[in-house]
Design a protein with these regions (language model features):
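Structural motif
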Residues: 8, 99-101, 142
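A nucleotide-sugar donor-handling region in carbohydrate enzymes
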Residues: 141-191
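An aromatic- and histidine-rich active-site surface loop
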Residues: 44, 101-115
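Short, acidic/turn-prone active-site loops that include or flank metal/cofactor-
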Residues: 16, 40, 60-67, 123-130, ...
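A conserved, positively charged/aromatic
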Residues: 120-122, 129, 133-143
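Conserved nucleotide-sugar phosphate-binding/catalytic loop shared by glycosyltransferases and other
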Residues: 6, 13, 31-79
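Short amphipathic alpha-helix
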Residues: 16-30
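An amphipathic, basic-hydrophobic alpha-helix
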Residues: 72-98
Length: 191
């Protein structure tokens, strides 16, 4: 990181794929002596993965935040309400501690904006695919995204990288296949 100052990081991610994306970075930062706090929501196996890693964490939505309704208006209203709840819960969480950097795939950029903490958001979709993310891009300091991703007017905030999200956890320097899985699928000679 360039200097010996130990920093306080807050990672907030809301999908199991982001656990895999951020896992090596979080473990590296912890190994280097930085303080890393983690906030999540209940989503599929995300909490199980975080527990398995042995990380301490805060679950902002232990019951999840997805609406079970099918009416489009109800889904929209539930989404707006959950967005506001998420921002409020992040506000309360970050009021307890001073952070140097926020890393997220969600609303933590808003908290970073008004708390004046640099925030990095990860996105691997073009802006025209998920237009509603514009608010998060506006409030983010930087957007981490594959080079090929078109972020439109937010390209000036993009920190592009060659590759895709899976590159972070499937790279040969990081990924080690489990021998029992290779045997199970008769892949031992092929690995």
């Amino acid at each position: 990181m360039g200097n010996d100052k130990k920093r306080n990081f807050l990672f907030f991610f809301v999908h199991p794929s982001k656990y895999y994306l951020f896992r090596n970075t979080i473990n590296y930062l912890k190994q280097e002596g930085h303080n890393v706090d983690i906030a999540i929501i209940k989503k599929d196996v995300l909490e199980d993965l975080v527990k398995q890693e042995g990380w301490e964490y805060t679950n902002l939505f232990p019951k999840g935040r997805r609406s079970t309704k099918t009416n489009r208006l109800t889904i929209f209203l539930a989404t707006v309400i959950n967005f506001i709840k998420t921002v409020w819960r992040l506000h309360k969480l970050t009021a307890k501690k001073r952070y140097d950097i926020y890393v997220t795939d969600d609303c933590l950029t808003i908290t970073g904006f008004y708390r004046k903490v640099p925030s990095y958001i990860f996105c691997d979709d073009d802006i025209n695919v998920i237009k509603e993310i514009s608010l998060l891009f506006k409030t983010a300091t930087y957007i981490i995204s594959p080079e090929c991703t078109n972020l439109g007017s937010f390209n000036n905030k993009k920190i592009g990288f060659k590759g895709y999200k899976a590159s972070s956890y499937l790279h040969p320097d990081v990924f080690v296949p489990q021998k029992e899985v290779l045997k199970k699928y008769d892949l031992c000679d092929k690995a």
